[in-house]
Amino acid sequence: GGKAKALKKIIKYFPEDLTEMVSPFFGGGAIEIHYAQKHKTRVHGYDLFSQLVNFWEMVLLDPERLTEEVAILKSAKPDLTEIWTQAQDTLRNTEVGQDNAFALAALFYGINRSSFSGATLSGGCSGEAYRKRFNTASIERLKNFKAPTLTVECADFEDSLSRHEPDVFVYADPPYLLEKSTRYGDKGSMHKDFDHLRLHEVMTQRNNW
């Protein structure tokens, strides 16, 4: 789940003066964004959830344009819970391209903010979440988002870690070891059959393990 509320407890275990970080399971990015914004740390974020990656890429590319798309979506569909299944299917079945990247990122944001615990494609809709989390204040925060030392790309943990030297600091927040979990990805696709043993093998090859 999200780490925003646990941020202070987590970062006390991080090195001081952290200049570079690799995050192979970016997700919501609370820890990574904190370091990119507050400490100017160079953060290399990766995730296999392609629609999530597209969202972050569009936020970093042009937050004002993305906000405009979100506003259009909210104006056209004032209550996403009424078209929930249709909206999720659109994200599942539409390939991201140059012409639709911002529109899909806006739809991802709307669904994420309107779903139980931000589960997006792995959870149901929540009218309460829609009212409290998909509102003017949240859209304004999106518009003002800045993190120039952050990048987010689509790659699995093995590929992403291989792109960086073994001594670069890694913050790894992998899927929980829950065989029946459906909390992340598309209906739990990021949880199902995740190879924790392979992750262990890859991580132990790095320096200072």
What are these regions (language model features)?
Residues 11, 142, 161, 196-203:
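Short amphipathic alpha-helical segments and helix-helix/interface helices
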Residues 56, 109, 209:
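A residue-level signal for conserved active-site and pocket-lining positions in enzyme catalytic cores
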Residues 12, 16-92, 132:
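SAM cofactor-binding core of SAM-dependent methyltransferases
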Residues 167-209:
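Conserved acidic-Pro-Pro-aromatic motif
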Residues 24-25, 46-47, 153-155, 172-175, ...:
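Short His-Asn-centered micro-motif
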Residues 1-7, 63-185:
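SAM-dependent nucleic-acid methyltransferase catalytic core
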Residues 17-21, 41-42, 147-151, 203-209:
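Short active-site oxyanion
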